[in-house]
Curated annotation (Swiss-Prot):
This is Regulatory protein RecX. The lineage of its organism: Bacteria, Bacillati, Bacillota, Bacilli, Bacillales. The keyword Cytoplasm applies. Keywords: Cytoplasm. It comes from Listeria monocytogenes serovar 1/2a (strain ATCC BAA-679 / EGD-e). InterPro entries: RecX_HTH_1st, RecX_HTH_2nd, RecX_HTH_3rd, Regulatory_RecX, WH-like_DNA-bd_sf.
Length: 269
């Protein structure tokens, strides 16, 4: 089989159409064209053509991978998954990854280190969440352990406290005890240890005093009483107390406040 003509593709000047015996047969990247010295008149066997096509697949995949990496640093697993979605053959994926590694495009430790630092600074995530994300990205336990060590206890407490302050602002209608429990639960879900979550909850709510809680209780009593005024006095009182207890106020605190402020559920005559 002889190459009878070669033409540049109109939409991609770096790719060439190869015609064998006057018929289009395949296309190749410019680098593959030069490597195999493809030119008019060259004779190729079926095995030659198959080898060239495989080399072109690797080259095409390599170009796609480099473009994929141009947006941000990726782990080896992320690149492998991307190439699979591009329907690359397994042999091509392995070859592409080797080439990328030789070109210093892949370094899982550097990726993990950069990813961890970014998450610490920009997302305030806890170490367990970051560890889980690194596992999903295909990093080894050894690499994960090394980079997580850089997340100091001081930085964890600082980030957890910042998260706690945000949680507190969103839940400023609850009693201090309930608020602290909410903070602890949310922080554990965000990847912090229970011990550190408790410390952050204590730190975030440290400035809440009895007066603050009394003010919150007053507002909640007024709001709940308005909501329940359509009920009989005894039912309205019970519903109000139940609602307040669900927000973390103790029964004794509620009763004391009602008594001290002479709040009655009886209808005014």
């Amino acid at each position: 089989m002889k190459i009878t003509s070669i033409s540049v593709q109109q939409k991609n000047k770096e790719r060439y159409n190869i015609f064998i015996d006057e018929k289009y047969n395949f296309s190749v990247d410019e680098e593959v064209l030069a490597r195999y010295q493809l030119m008019k008149g060259k004779v190729l066997t079926e095995a030659d053509i198959e080898e060239i096509k495989q080399a072109d697949m690797v080259r095409k995949g390599l170009n796609k991978a480099i473009n994929f990496l141009s947006h941000r640093v990726r782990s080896e697993k992320e690149i492998r998954d991307y190439l699979r979605k591009q329907e690359m053959e397994p042999f091509a994926i392995d070859e592409i990854l080797k080439k990328l590694a030789n070109m210093d495009y892949i370094n899982d430790f550097e990726f993990a280190e950069l990813y961890t630092k970014t998450q610490i600074k920009t997302t305030l995530k806890g170490p367990r969440t970051i560890e889980r994300e690194l596992v999903e990205k295909g990093l080894t336990r050894e690499i994960i352990s090394r980079v997580i060590e850089e997340y100091s206890d001081e930085a964890q407490l600082e980030n957890a406290t910042k998260q706690a302050m945000k949680i507190m602002k969103r839940n400023n209608k609850s009693a201090k005890k309930m608020l602290q429990q909410k903070i602890i639960t949310d922080l554990i879900q965000k990847g912090f240890t229970s011990e550190l979550a408790k410390a952050a909850a204590t730190e975030a709510t440290s400035e809440l005093d009895v007066a603050d809680e009394a003010e919150i209780l007053q507002k909640q009593i007024e709001k709940t009483m308005r909501k329940n005024k359509r009920y009989k006095p005894s039912i309205a009182k019970q519903k109000t107390i139940t609602s307040l207890m669900q927000k973390g106020f103790s029964y004794d605190t509620i009763q004391s406040y009602l008594t001290e402020n002479e709040i009655s559920f009886e209808e005014e005559e």
